[in-house]
Amino acid sequence: MKKRGLWLLIGIGIVLMGGLLGRSLWQPDPTNLVTHGLEQLQTATSFRYSLTQHQWVDGKDRVLTQIQGEKSGGNTRILGQMTGSEVEMIKIGDSTYSKDPFNKKWIRFANAPAAQEVFLAELNPLSSLQMKELGEVMLSGQGNVNGEKVWICNLKPSVQNQMMEVFWTDFQYTLYIRKSDKMLVKVTIEAKNKAKSDPMTMTLEFKDIGKKINIQAPDI
């Protein structure tokens, strides 16, 4: 009886170890993982984000853009620096406002569509994630973003963003997808300038996805 009990325990132990080993070795399909992560973020009603863009200029690495933003429905607010200047903007539906960095007064753009096109990546970070084709998607490993475990995927897509296509080429994307809910939480985009072949890197991070965010028009 004792031997039978011992063998039973050993058998249970082997099954449990096999299950844990199989779970640790299991890897998701990278294309499905990326597709699901992009779709979840594109359909999110709200989120907060950061955007940092580096570019080599005259042989030196320059930070062109460094902003914090939040988006709720059709409304967006950003705060940070672009090309060395302070920027604070609010987009409410079809209206866009900018705070003068010197007198701190808000002004409303007369031509809101033109302003939104110029600041497309900053006011709508998801525009940088629009793709015609994903291309080959590779699962390069696992990592950690802000204390959360993620899958890391690499791809060289065909982008669907006119502004990006005009100035950049050879796009390489690295996507960080949270394991717990398959949500896309970080993206690194690398590309080369079409005119000079200088490298560019853009990093996007997303948080508070789906949470309530209140964005209102400023007093002008």
What are these regions (language model features)?
Residues 2-75, 212-220:
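N-terminal leader/targeting segments and the immediate start of mature chains
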Residues 28, 128-139:
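A short, amphipathic edge element
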Residues 36-39, 66-73, 93-94, 173-179, ...:
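Extended lipid/amphipathic-ligand handling interfaces
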Residues 44-50, 71-79, 146-154, 162, ...:
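Short, hydrophobic/aromatic-rich segments at coil-to-beta transitions
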Residues 51-55, 80-83, 100-102, 188-193:
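Beta-turn initiation residues at beta-strand->coil junctions
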Residues 81, 133-134, 165-169:
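Short loop/turn motifs at secondary-structure junctions and domain boundaries
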Residues 99-127:
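Acidic/charged, solvent-exposed loop-and-adjacent secondary-structure segments enriched in E/D, K/R, S/T
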Residues 149-220:
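Gly/Pro-enriched, hydrophobic low-complexity segments
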